[in-house]
A protein has these predicted regions:
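Extended alpha-helical solenoid/rod scaffold regions
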Residues: 1-244
Length: 244
């Protein structure tokens, strides 16, 4: 009876009423044998194309997530719903759950948002994965073990090419780890002396230093020449004075 009534509401263009009926079934306020309110709601959103789809999803997703996080998450990443207008509320709903990192990755790779917070969170997640492997801290991409190279290549390319993340926040996340990534972020922040020093003395990679200079410009090339022709590390440190 309730399922039939919900379908009747859909046929009459009253999607909200149908969703309310399925919610009552899903939460046990109404009972009908063989009818799962959660499944009915999820199935509805996969085929409904009304202009109010996004607004309805924002309204009814929380109860679906409370009852079945797995089904709610599967709907969100199914690409059958444009969730770009409601990403913030969804992140609030997911909180610190196990689904959050996968959702952030999905959003970053699916939508052209140019959102600083999401881009920064995405980069932070990837960096923290790499930080679990101390062997990666002082090596270039070419020196990275094959098992980690594809994942690392992805975040290195992201840090170089993405203009949306906060380099200051990412530098804080990096701390003293992952020197290659630090070089890239320091270059973005125009801290060229420190970036080049790490490239030469920690990574021992002139190639990485040159890549830094190509991004930073002529002044960086001058610093690199000074580093390459200085006799000791101490001379370089002294030459920085109060700049560092």
């Amino acid at each position: 009876m309730f399922a039939a009534l919900a379908q009747f509401c859909v046929s009459k263009g009253n999607a909200r009423k149908a969703l309310e009926i399925w919610k009552q079934l899903g939460e046990g306020e109404s009972v009908e044998t063989g009818v799962d309110g959660v499944e009915k709601t999820v199935d509805f959103f996969t085929i409904y194309d009304g202009e109010d789809k996004c607004a309805l999803l924002e309204e009814f997703l929380p109860w679906v997530y409370a009852k079945s996080p797995e089904k709610a998450f599967s709907l969100l990443v199914s690409k059958k719903v444009d969730i770009s207008p409601i990403i913030r509320p969804i992140l609030g709903l997911l909180g610190d759950s196990a689904y959050r990192s996968e959702f952030v990755e999905f959003v970053q790779n699916t939508y052209d948002l140019h959102d600083s917070e999401i881009s920064t969170e995405f980069a932070t997640q990837r960096i923290r994965e790499l930080q679990k492997e101390p062997a990666l801290f002082n090596c270039t991409l070419d020196e990275t073990p094959k098992a980690f190279r594809p994942r690392r290549a992805e975040i290195v390319a992201f840090l170089r090419d993405n203009a949306d993340y906060s380099p200051a926040d990412i530098l804080e996340v990096l701390g003293e780890t992952l020197v290659l990534e630090r070089v890239i972020v320091l270059t973005r922040l125009r801290h060229c002396e420190e970036a080049l020093h790490l490239a030469i003395y920690s990574l021992r990679s002139v190639r990485t230093a040159c890549e830094c200079c190509r991004t930073a410009g002529m002044d960086a090339w001058k610093i690199l020449l000074q580093l390459l022709f200085s006799e000791t590390d101490e001379e370089w440190v002294d030459s920085r004075g109060d700049d560092g």
